[in-house]
Every structure is written in C-alpha cells, then in structure tokens.
Amino acid sequence: EFVFIQSKTNGQIKTYTGPIMVTISAQESMVVFNPKTKRFEETADFEKARQIFTSAPEGWYVVLKNPSIDGTHPDSAKAMNSPELQIGKKINISGPCSFSLFPGQMAKVVQGHKLRSNQYLIARVYDADAASKSVATIVDAEGKEVKAETEKYFVGQLLVIKGTEVSFYMPPTGIEVIANKDSYVRDAVTLERLEYAILKDEDGEKRYVHGPAVVFPKPTETFVNSPKGGVIFRALE
C-alpha cells in the first residue's frame, strides 16, 4: 500500500510506500488524486487515503500515464519526493509487475488479448516513434511466441490484428487497443457457401466477399446490413 502526504508550507507531495510507519504533523495532510478533475483532494480519512499497488500478473499489462523520465517507481519502505514526470505521455508495461504511483500518475490494468480464429482487434497508433522502437508480445495461431517486425508507423494509424494470424496480443508502448463497448475483442463474420457480405469503406467503395470465408473488415470499413437483418446475404441459387 502507499499514501500521498502533502506539505502545507510548500505544497510538495511525497509518496509513502509500505511497509512504513507514517506520522503526520500539523503542517502536513493526506491527499488523494482525482483522475477526473486532475486535482489533489485533502482527506482526513486514512482508509480513503491509502491506496493499493498497481499490479499486473503474467499475461496482463499496465497502461501508465505520466511516467517518470527515468522510468522509476517509488521505492518500498520509503518516503520519496516526486521526480520529473513526462506529463501527457503514456506507456505500456507488461506483467508480471507491481508498483506504487507517484503523485499525478494514473494506471489501468488490462488483460492480454486472447483471440480465436474468427475474432480480431482494432488498434490505434498514438506515438509513432515509441511504437517503432517497442516490441509487441504476440503469440501466433500455433501457440508460438513471435517477435513482431519493426514497422514504420504514423500517428492515428489504425491496425487490424486478426485471430487467424495471432492468438494472443499485448500492444507495445505507442499502440493502444480500441475497446468495443464492454470488450476489446471483436467478432469477424463467418460465411458459409452461397453466402456473402458487403463492406462499405469511408470513401463509399464497396467490397463483396463470398463464402466460405471469415471476413475481417478494414479499420475504415463497415458491414452493410441485410434487408432481413444482420450482415449476411444469401446468394440466389
């Protein structure tokens, strides 16, 4: 566990990381960081002030906002001043890992993305330089871990990760997987013989795919709905 203590004289905030005995003077107060308002709020409730470590087991990863410039985390059993942070930056840290946060940092723990052959992910590049230097964790359809080839990315680029090629994926720093409602994994469309699907691109161009096939849309494509409902059309015999 850890807690933030702020000095009332100079406003400096220290991170107290357990195991440690905390004694609060009259010139100090406990504070908590509100991620919505991006402000520190004073509290006299120790149960509210103390926070648990950000922990990710094997096969999970942490999305950490505002990392320290040197990549360090608060030391255990110490009270530490906050180092200079990379405000506005975001990095991905693969598990297993466990650490407390510096004041102003925000973290989200995400399970690695498991894909069946008829599922896919859509990911977005938010930091092209970092994405080109980082390496994703990828397991292919045969269960073998593969090293992703370094690519040239551009900010805003959308990527489709197909379950026919990848069975497990954890994005490197610079790439984020886009959520689809309550899940990250999206279902492709499976076509049988005499069935087909129509995909419409942002430029109005249509693509027809005939079964049997598993159809993965491009990032800019959407399925055209059938008059009978759904996105699968039946060919005339």
Positions of PLM-derived features:
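N-terminal hydrophobic membrane-entry segments
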Residues: 1-237
